[in-house]
Amino acid sequence: MHDTTALSRPTAKDYTPADNPRFTKLHRRFPTVVDLRKHAPRHAPRFAFEYLDGGAGSDGGIARNWNALDAIELVPRYGVTTVLPSVGIDVFGKHYAAPLGVAPMGGPSIVWPGADRYLAAACQRINVPYALGLVGGMTVEDAAKVAPDVLWFQLYRCWRDEHAIGFDLVRRAQAVGVHVLVLTVDVPVRTTRTREVKAGITSPFRPDLRMIASILASPGYLSALWKHGQPRLGNLQPYTKDSADANEVAAFVRREMGGAFTWDEIARYRERWQRPLVIKGILHPADAEKCVALGADLAFAGKAFLWGLAALGAEGPGHVLDIMIDEMRSAFGQIGAQQPADARSVLVRHPGALQF
């Protein structure tokens, strides 16, 4: 009898880690993202690791998130697939190699100089979404040259002068072919991140002897800094005076940005943006349930890619994507999911779920 449940092999456009000749060698040393995290403080300066690894306050939120995710149990299902499944998906009319992408991040070049370029290049090579953050270190114009097929762009609320800067950024993104605009609604104020403050990441930024010594003790970081220069908020530089240094641009950002988008403001951005629009920051359980019911198609990660950068430099983002895609294919095979959409029907046990 013909087995209609068997899955055909991945199509030519579906990337797998086997396509990367460096994967096997890197995988021996760093088989998981956790291994990259352990190695990161040995390879990058201390202040860079504290900046990327910490959270708000005492890191209690990070611990709760880890515990909640670790408590999820996926019940295996066998006799469904005969090969490792393809994890390719179609989102907003585009095909991607996996249902994951690089989240928009602020200041990744503090973690590793040139970070935005390395992140964008890895996403373009592997074919997964790359969301450039407004306060990243690369302009949307430059990002479009590095990652023309996978570029998304994230905005915070630039409210002054009737959103003049925000609307101009939308114009710039549209002009260079950004595929998806992301509006962040879950950062109405900036919280205190204790570990980065103690490590010297403050505004205005004044590096001390301890930070300089840490850079000198990290030759890979020093080489990247020499090549790419100090971090800059490239997307916002055009709206400041030509002679503005990094601290002056940071002060400008604090004046221009703030608060969360209102729904009326989102509607105004929607009128100006003719392509897919994503609202980032859904936190309420009822809202999350609605998203799942409507069919959430992909997830974004941030810290994992920063751990990869801190541990491996330029090779880090690509190796993190390889790890995730490799693990995802194995997990889908174990739970009998022949494609990402099938994962929604898998039996899930979650005894550690937060109750509201």
Describe the predicted segments one by one:
Residues 2-93, 201-261, 343, 348-356:
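An N-cap/entry alpha-helix motif that binds or orients negatively charged groups
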Residues 45, 162, 312-313:
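Glycine-centered helix-coil hinge/cap
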Residues 65, 309-328:
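C-terminal helical cap(s) of enzyme catalytic domains, especially alpha/beta-barrels
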Residues 96-135:
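Glycine-rich active-site/cofactor-binding loop and its immediate structural neighborhood
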Residues 100-103, 130-132, 151-155, 181, ...:
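Hydrophobic faces of well-ordered beta-strands that scaffold small-molecule active sites
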Residues 107, 120-121, 145-146, 160-307:
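Alpha/beta enzyme core
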Residues 124-166:
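A gly/proline- and charged-residue-enriched helix-loop-helix capping module
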Residues 324-341:
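N-terminal pre-core extensions flanking Radical SAM catalytic domains
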